[in-house]
From Swiss-Prot:
GO terms for cellular component: cytosol. The active site is at residues 136, 140. It comes from Acidiphilium cryptum (strain JF-5). It comes from the Bacteria. It catalyses: (S)-2,3,4,5-tetrahydrodipicolinate + NAD(+) + H2O = (2S,4S)-4-hydroxy-2,3,4,5-tetrahydrodipicolinate + NADH + H(+); (S)-2,3,4,5-tetrahydrodipicolinate + NADP(+) + H2O = (2S,4S)-4-hydroxy-2,3,4,5-tetrahydrodipicolinate + NADPH + H(+). This is 4-hydroxy-tetrahydrodipicolinate reductase. (S)-2,3,4,5-tetrahydrodipicolinate binds at residues 137, 146-147. GO terms for biological process: diaminopimelate biosynthetic process; lysine biosynthetic process via diaminopimelate. Its EC number is 1.17.1.8. Pathway: Amino-acid biosynthesis; L-lysine biosynthesis via DAP pathway; (S)-tetrahydrodipicolinate from L-aspartate: step 4/4.
Length: 247
């Protein structure tokens, strides 16, 4: 299916990202099938759409997974901050429909994620401490950001460990010395910062920093629409920016 024939629906069209998506869809040569707010009729939207892009809230993810799987409609999911139960529901949906999930749709930040994994594999945890720093606008409701967690997970994969076993995001007060192999997180909030992420590797003799600054929220909308165009016609399964970018 070419872009001109592709009907894209937007869940969360009344939000900041949803409005940008509504502008980005026709610019990419696709057709805007319609959109709903977080409490709208997703089943009806799914019937009118070849792909649904979802930027709503974490509490809706499980319900949306069931509705879109039942409708057979491919799903581009940009919502973050959901719990393990919702993650399981996404996996169940991916057995029936193609699901494209990303914490961040900017190509550049996904290159940072790929490089973070490479550095995690190359720089020993015993010599190089890994810290993830992120800053976002004051309205953001989850921390660390989904992108920060994705960067941390990439470092952990490179080191052959599970992020949950080494994640340190609660430093406050008398914490004691830093644990060898820990992956630390710090989240800053203020103003209207679109999104800044850094992966910092520090040893006794050097420091390596990977940084990405998003300057305009349109980069996320354009990436999500690109993902929708790519996802249409794919087999059921889970896909992400690595697949889209060939990383």
């Amino acid at each position: 299916m070419n872009g001109a024939d592709l009907r894209i629906g937007i869940a969360g069209i009344t939000g900041r990202m949803g409005k940008l998506l509504a502008e980005a869809v026709p610019l990419a040569g696709a057709t805007l099938a319609g959109g709903i707010g977080r409490d709208g009729d997703l089943a009806a939207l799914a019937r009118e759409s070849d792909v649904v892009i979802d930027f709503t809230v974490a509490a809706t993810v499980s319900r949306h997974a069931g509705i879109l799987a039942a409708a057979g409609t491919p799903w581009v999911l940009g919502t973050t901050g959901f719990d393990p139960a919702a993650e399981a529901d996404i996996a169940d949906a991916a057995a029936r429909i193609p699901v494209f999930q990303a914490a961040n749709f900017a190509p550049g930040v996904n290159l940072v994620i790929a490089l973070a994994e490479r550095l995690g594999a190359t720089l020993a945890a015993e010599t190089h401490d890994a810290e993830i720093l992120e800053m976002h606008h004051r309205q953001k409701i989850d921390a660390p950001s989904g992108t920060a967690l994705a960067i941390g997970a990439a470092v952990a994969r490179g080191r052959g460990v599970d992020l949950a076993a080494v994640k340190d995001s609660g430093r406050d007060g008398h914490t004691g010395k830093r644990e060898t192999g820990a992956i630390g997180f710090a989240a800053l909030r203020g103003g209207q910062i679109v999104g800044s992420h850094s992966a910092i590797f520090t040893s006794a003799v050097e420091q390596i920093t990977l940084t990405h600054h998003a300057l305009d929220r349109r980069i996320f909308a354009e990436g999500a629409v690109r993902a929708a165009l790519w996802l249409a016609g794919r087999a059921p399964g889970r896909y992400g920016m690595r697949d889209l970018l060939g990383l």
